[in-house]
Amino acid sequence: MGICDPIHQLGMWDDFNSSFPSTSATMILEVDKCLEDQIPIMEKRLDNETEDTSHGTVGTSNRYEPETSKPVEKVLRRLAQNREAARKSRLRKKAYVQQLENSKLKLIQLEQELERARKQGMCVGGGVDASQLSYSGTASSGTAVFDMEYGHWVEEQTRQTNDLRIALHSQIGEAELRIIVDGYLNHYFDLFRMKATAAKADVLYIMSGMWKTSAERFFMWIGGFRPSELLKVLTPHLELLTEQQLREVCNLTQSCQQAEDALSQGMVKLHQILAEAVAAGRLGEGNYTLPQMGPAIEKLEDLVRFVNQADHLRQETLQQMSRILNTCQAAQGLLALGEYFERLRVLSSQWATRLREPT
């Protein structure tokens, strides 16, 4: 079973005003001025030559006309080409400057959102001691970005769920519905890629489910939903399944359960090994150095692979269900899945409100 391991990089733009050469603009202006000075002279010279030709003999005009007109036309054509090249160069420079400015604004906005998310994380974790804060500060930069991206992901999922609901009620064409279904699936795949990046920054944060609501955390399995359980949730909402489809859904559910059992057994074994590694220190030392905690840290790195494998199983399950079902059935299943998570989030909100009410 493969492991999804995307790599995200964030490039930094250098300051354009301090690095972009200013001489190019001056050169362009000088070329324009030179062209503007030369064109009237050329036009006047052509007028004089035309006047002289009109007063001269016909034989002389016919004799020297090819030699005179060809160089002049060539020069004028070259001057026109130079002016057009200078104009295009100015337009390219203007577009490049605008692109740099837009990139700077986006980068500043991202840094501001990241700083706000980091401050919010510090407020939420205000109950821990200073040593925990100093440790979590090194890992929170990656998880803060994930928190911000996941918040946007939930908002987009809510919008896509509403679009899917409207599409099913309006009975649009199958081709249009397939576009919506594929977009909904890709939205889940984006989440798996986001989680893979965040797990490398702090896998325990992903495993803890602190980025989800309390009701969602209650049903979590290795950093996300259990595929076989969600198949049971959405299958009753599918209409007119054929016998072949029912068999394939049943086989898929059994395959998911077997894969889940294998991963769960591996997690139990990893839990035992990690506990033994942490407890391996001598009694009374009190000085927990990095070499002493090295074996435990290596086991936490193994935990990243478990999270990625679990997400890979979730992605494969969604893809297989999309293959088994027709377009309308797939839309119904994804709508049931989206509304299920919406109900869990509403349940968490209502439960939290109930706890704040006076008894």
From Swiss-Prot:
Gene Ontology CC terms, in alphabetical order: nucleus
- Keyword annotations from UniProtKB, A to Z: Activator, Coiled coil, DNA-binding, Nucleus, Transcription, Transcription regulation
Q: Write down the SUPFAM superfamilies for this protein, in alphabetical order.
A: Leucine zipper domain
> Which Gene3D superfamilies has this protein been placed in?
1.20.5.170
Coiled-coil regions listed = 73-125
Locations listed in the record: Nucleus
Q: Where is this region: Disordered?
A: 44-72
Function according to Swiss-Prot or TrEMBL: Transcriptional activator that binds specifically to the DNA sequence 5'-TGACG-3'. Recognizes ocs elements like the as-1 motif of the cauliflower mosaic virus 35S promoter. Binding to the as-1-like cis elements mediate auxin- and salicylic acid-inducible transcription. Could also bind to the Hex-motif (5'-TGACGTGG-3') another cis-acting element found in plant histone promoters.
PANTHER family assigned:
TRANSCRIPTION FACTOR TGA4, TRANSCRIPTION FACTOR TGA9
* Family affiliation: Belongs to the bZIP family.
Subunit-level organization: Binds DNA as a dimer.
Q: What is the protein name stated in its UniProt record?
A: TGACG-sequence-specific DNA-binding protein TGA-1A
Q: Which organism is it from?
A: Nicotiana tabacum
